[in-house]
């Protein structure tokens, strides 16, 4: 009797999580049907792989729903932490099925690496001869990143501020409030965000097509640009369009659109026309991009590269790395030591909170600068009282603690991952840049192996699994995962 009660209590605690996961898996299966239809029309053998994958995902979703359908979804904070991590892990796992069963016939390690990289919108790849893949698989790679982009926006707007992860309480809005009274407004903001995301994607696809891309390439690059994911339909990434500068400028624009806060787009459409330009995150990101692009363009021109070519290539690749998209139109690691070091530093920055971008996020650097300024003030005026504000909100101890803790564990994770990779035999540059690009969800690293002109395929399997962990931890803002590893969390 006691055992039965214990099982029932356990089911009630975990049922809301399983029920939400069932819905997410169902959505994944529905989107798998899109490349399946393309493959059926083109009579490609990969259609069978997608059919089997859909059947497996639907079976898991149906079983979870049957077990939990009578139990209402009411999530407590601990369930939100578990759900956030499990959703990314399980979706990445299921998304890898077509890559294992399909024409590439990847090993489990390579398939999971590719899907984790896609869903987390990192953009690192182990695939070669991408041009030879079926249209369905090319489309699936784009869809995975596009779905990951949606998940990132929802997480950044509605979940992480609620969980107070890494100073994200700064961006607490009605969409971050999970009380019953506010849920209708949360749903409204979710619909508005999805509409804007889809609208930008359609606009990007049309622009790329009119700019000279094929219909399939236009659609895939539109999805991966807005998701700041970086998957392309060529081994050369955007280098395949290096002779078409109009496409590079379009790509720069749409990557930037994906890296800005989507909540501010909603405010803009609702009448607050200056919402974007007045936001300190946006101001900081645009200023950083302007200064870096200007400096590196001057550097490239001084090296003998034509001015317009320098400006185009620098703008595209700087925007790509800062927004953590990961496209490459040129091997910028060969631009010289100055550019090499600059791109390594830019790997950590990231875009804005509430966007599809990864990295540390620009607001944490801004908050750190405010904390540094206050500390210098205290040294000069020991009895002074200083209250810094960010976006007209006071920086409370709760927020500053979150930012400091996140920053510490972010770099600790990079350092630990780099050490693990070096123990597996990777050279210093590959280990350090690989760890940084994984945790920051950027995509390419530096050096000959995993740089903009390289690929992650040569790495040992153990290194790929470590990088998968790094990509997931980076996407889940580090602390969301670490809290699950503490005994205190499970006792409560």
From Swiss-Prot:
Its main location: membrane. Signal peptide: none annotated. One of its GO terms (cellular component) is plasma membrane. The chain crosses the membrane at residues 20-40, 47-67, 81-101, 143-163, 196-216, 246-266, 282-302, 334-354, 403-423, 465-485. It is found in: Cell inner membrane. Keywords: Cell inner membrane, Cell membrane, Ion transport, Membrane, Potassium, Potassium transport, Transmembrane, Transmembrane helix, Transport. InterPro entries: Cat_transpt, TrkH. It comes from the Bacteria. The keyword Ion transport applies. GO terms for molecular function: potassium:chloride symporter activity. Pfam families: TrkH (PF02386). The keyword Ion transport applies. It is a multi-pass membrane protein. Medium-affinity potassium transport system. Probably interacts with Trk system potassium uptake protein TrkA. Main K(+) transporter in osmotically adapted cells. PANTHER family: TRK SYSTEM POTASSIUM UPTAKE PROTEIN, TRK SYSTEM POTASSIUM UPTAKE PROTEIN TRKG-RELATED. Belongs to the TrkH potassium transport family. This is Trk system potassium uptake protein TrkI. The lineage of its organism: Bacteria, Pseudomonadati, Pseudomonadota, Gammaproteobacteria, Oceanospirillales. The gene is trkI.
